[in-house]
Amino acid sequence: MAVRKVRCPQCGKDALWAPENPWRPFCSERCKQIDLGCWASDSYRIPVPDDSNEPGTDPDPTSRA
């Protein structure tokens, strides 16, 4: 099986996609830890669809009286 090279999502360097690379898809432990830190500090977020039309939701929380 041929070893694939992929771009490290953190720094953009080539990284091996193989069992020999324990940090895949990252090129190094450092890049893996930087990425984990970004998730932990909320630098990365997964977009959530706007559910304002869903029953039971208050579209404007300041309108409560």
Curated annotation (Swiss-Prot):
GO biological process: regulation of DNA-templated transcription
A molecular function (GO) term: zinc ion binding
Keywords associated with the record: Metal-binding, Zinc
Annotated spans, Disordered: 43-65
Domain of life: Bacteria
Family the entry assigns: Belongs to the DNA gyrase inhibitor YacG family.
Keyword set includes rRNA processing: no
Protein purpose: Inhibits all the catalytic activities of DNA gyrase by preventing its interaction with DNA. Acts by binding directly to the C-terminal domain of GyrB, which probably disrupts DNA binding by the gyrase.
Lineage, highest ranks first: Bacteria, Pseudomonadati, Pseudomonadota, Betaproteobacteria, Rhodocyclales
Identification of the protein by name: DNA gyrase inhibitor YacG
Cofactor binding note of this UniProt entry: Binds 1 zinc ion.
Cofactor: Zn(2+)
Keyword Metal-binding: yes
UniProt binding sites for Zn(2+): C8, C11, C27, C31
Assembly mode: Interacts with GyrB.
InterPro entries found in the cross-reference section: DNA_gyrase_inhibitor_YacG (IPR005584), Znf_NHR/GATA (IPR013088)
